[in-house]
Structure formats: structure tokens, C-alpha cells
Amino acid sequence: MKVKVFSLNGEPIEEITLPKVFQTPFRPDLIKRAVIASWTHRIQPQGRDPLAGKRRVTENIGKGRGMARVERIKTSPRFAAFVPFARGGRRAHPPKVEKVIWEGINKKEKKLALMSAIAATANYDLVRARGHVIDNIPQVPLVVENELEKVYRTAQTREIFKKLGIWEDIERAKRNTKVRAGKGKMRGRRYKKAKGPLIVVAKNEGIIQGARNHPGVDVVVVDNLGVELLAPGAHPGRLTIWTKGAIERLREFYG
């Protein structure tokens, strides 16, 4: 499959052949498993103090007193202690740090999921179905010359994005930024933000600084590429801008 390489002005300058990884079959099941595995590895284990509610000297008063035979405070037999239903007692089934909360995925399946997610970025129908605005984009996938990696000013990247036809998708991401419902607003998750274009580069020479402030835009070096960036929310087909150097780096990885 051949694609055109575009300059920063949005004009085609050459034609290259995409690596074989872009021909990988579409596997949404593996992509979802890989994304969930990535999510669960960010969860922090939580548990309770094993001695919580047990730091009391108690005794069993026995039968024959017309009272429930529960553990009671030794110096005040009127008050129950230690048992789950008593004030200040232990929890019946507290969360434990030993609980296995990570979802696993096999190495070969994880690799195939990444390859399938990369190939999904070249599928026009999947990119459109994901909600991206791609009416003015010359081609999918969009490959740009390596000079993009050296742009470090936000104003410059804005003009480049307008010439490449992806600015409308960034505006869509900005419009879809909403205040979260519920108590998540108090817990560092105030806004729900839409995902816009992903920029994949061979090396960072300033582009991360230049593009990171645009709503919904992510920039990543191809060596650090992951399934969650290519398929946010386990929905493959993210609008992706590749530099020519990143494409050549993929060719080294996958042939």
C-alpha cells in the first residue's frame, strides 16, 4: 500500500510504501484486552489495617446472664467489642492488598493487539466511525515530513494543523470537553475530555512542547507507542499523523 508524504504546507512531496504492519487483520477483541490490561496496571492496591478493631482486651462472659454471648470489653462488660457488628469492631470482609487486580495478557497477543491497532489507524471507515472529523484530510493514514518533529511553538503547530486539515477535529475535541457528573469532580477528575489526533514521531526535537497544549492532542515517540494511545477507551481507529521517520522505524520493527 502506497501513500503520499505531505509537507508542512499540506502539499504532497513524495510517495512511500507502508510497512507490512498496516496489513494486520482487525482484532478488536485483542485490542480491548490489551487496553484493559493497561488500565488495571495503574490501579493502586488498597487494604485495611489487619489489626483494626482488634486492639482491645476482651473476654467471653459465658452463658446464664441473659445477655448475648459476644466478646465484651474486659473492664466494661456492658460494651461489645472485636466482633464486626460492635462499635469499633473489626470489618467482616475488608479489602486486602493481596487481591489480584491486574488483568494479564500474553506477550504474543499483546504484540498482535498493538499491530492491529496500528493497522486500524489506516482504515478510513474505522477512523470516521470513531467520531473524528476527517472531511478535509487528504488521506488516511496521514504521513508528514520529518520537519514536523522540530516545530516547538504552539502557534506554528496550529497553522500546520490547519493546512493539513486536522484542525477541525481538534475543535471537535475542544467542544466535547465537559464537566464530569458526580463526585469525581472533587477527586481530580473534573473534566471529561475528548480525544483528538495522535502524532507519532521518530524522535522528539520540540514537537511535544509545540503540540501538547492543543485539546485532545497526544504526541508520542514511536518507540513508546502503546495500544491505549492508538485505541483510547478500547475503541480503535484513532486519527493518527505519522512522520516519515516514524514509518521507517515501524518498518525496522515489523518489516
Curated annotation (Swiss-Prot):
Protein biosynthesis listed as a keyword: no
Keywords for the protein's UniProt record, in alphabetical order: Ribonucleoprotein, Ribosomal protein, RNA-binding, rRNA-binding
A Gene Ontology BP annotation from the UniProt entry: translation
Gene Ontology cellular-component annotations: ribonucleoprotein complex; ribosome
Cross-referenced Pfam families: Ribosomal_L4
Cell membrane found in the keyword field: no
Domain of life (superkingdom): Archaea
PROSITE patterns assigned to the protein according to its UniProt record, in alphabetical order: RIBOSOMAL_L1E (PS00939)
Signal peptide (UniProt feature, chain positions): none
Record's function text: One of the primary rRNA binding proteins, this protein initially binds near the 5'-end of the 23S rRNA. It is important during the early stages of 50S assembly. It makes multiple contacts with different domains of the 23S rRNA in the assembled 50S subunit and ribosome.
Description of how the protein assembles with itself and partners: Part of the 50S ribosomal subunit.
This protein's name: Large ribosomal subunit protein uL4
Organism: Thermococcus sibiricus (strain DSM 12597 / MM 739)
Classification of source organism: Archaea, Methanobacteriati, Methanobacteriota, Thermococci, Thermococcales
